[in-house]
């Protein structure tokens, strides 16, 4: 019985720690500089070591931004309506049920588009080519 209680406490503490993500100061500073008006920010650490902030900006849809551990901005994803996807992307998705769509701006200046179809994220360039 004592072992079960100890195991239960360990699991609870482990789960709590897994969901409470505190990025390094350099990441927080980079985020605040890029998104000074961000609200309702929730941080998580991804498997690849990147830090992801999910947040809202006044007058915008839901957003997320990824940063490297040293504070470099990597990309920003903004939720958009299906109708806001470029026409070639919409054509490439014809006949598919799209649950969510997003525009992803990359640090190299490129923009790609994401469409969630059957629990999978499909990525396209503006010409409708799947990447």
Predicted feature residues:
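Amphipathic N-proximal alpha-helical interface segments
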Residues: 53-77, 120-131
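Short, non-transmembrane alpha-helical segments in secretory-pathway proteins
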Residues: 21-40, 81-101
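N-terminal targeting signals for Sec/Tat export/insertion, comprising classic cleavable signal peptides
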Residues: 29-62
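Hydrophobic/anchoring residues in structured secondary elements
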Residues: 43-45, 78, 103-106
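Short, glycine/charged-rich beta-strand-loop motifs at protein surfaces that mediate ligand recognition
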Residues: 17, 76-79
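Flexible "stalk/tail and boundary" regions
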Residues: 90, 95, 99-113, 126-131
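Conserved histidines in hydrophobic membrane contexts and catalytic metal-binding motifs
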Residues: 53-54, 106, 111-121
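Bacterial Sec-dependent N-terminal signal peptides
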Residues: 1-23
């Amino acid at each position: 019985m004592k072992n079960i209680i100890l195991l239960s406490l360990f699991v609870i503490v482990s789960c709590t720690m897994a969901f409470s993500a505190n990025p390094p100061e350099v990441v927080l500073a980079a985020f605040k500089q890029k998104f000074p008006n961000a609200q309702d920010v929730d941080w998580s650490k991804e498997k690849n070591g990147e830090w992801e902030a999910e947040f809202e900006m006044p007058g915008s849809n839901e957003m997320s931004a990824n940063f490297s551990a040293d504070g470099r901005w990597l990309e920003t994803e903004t939720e958009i309506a299906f109708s806001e996807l470029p026409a070639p992307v919409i054509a490439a998705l014809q006949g598919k049920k799209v649950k969510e769509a997003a525009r992803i701006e990359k640090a190299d200046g490129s923009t790609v588009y994401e469409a969630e179809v059957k629990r999978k994220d499909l990525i396209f360039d503006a010409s409708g080519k799947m990447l």
